[in-house]
Amino acid sequence: TAPAAGTVSAINRGAKRILQSVVIDIEGDDEETFKFFSSDELTGLSKDVVINNLVESGLWTALRTRPYSAVPAIDSEASAIFVAAMDTSPLAGDPSVIIAENADSFADGLDVLARLTSGKVYVGKAPGSKIPTGKDSSVTSEEFSGPHPAGLVGTHIHFLSPVSATKTVWTVGYQD
């Protein structure tokens, strides 16, 4: 989803043709706006309102199904939703540092995800990390430790709610 419509007027490159900036002349003022909900309103939102806002904003495509890693159908429901708030990849940054910058927004996002399933929202985290879980009782935090692939969402799914041809779960990245 683009924040505005316009025409590319300049592409600025530096040494060795490294891209430094792209200048876009914005046409008009027809920006997209979305309904805003306060933190207190989020737990009372209906599933339809959440789905409509995610689809209109283009964020619905951040959700992925397991198995098959496809964008979920709008009329489908996951048996659980997984958020991997840890990364065991070599040289990976610490997600708890990134999440701490907007901890309240992260917790609000988990509460909104809980509207999309009648099951649980699992937040996979490293032992001892300070990851918020929101206000909704269906959001649960699970700790995983060990070398890679302990931080992969597929590992979390395997141990907490294994999928099959008839059972689908959804995943979303912690930065989405």
Where are these regions (language model features)?
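Generic structural motif
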Residues: 1-10
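Buried, small/hydrophobic-residue-enriched core segments of structured protein domains
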Residues: 14-176
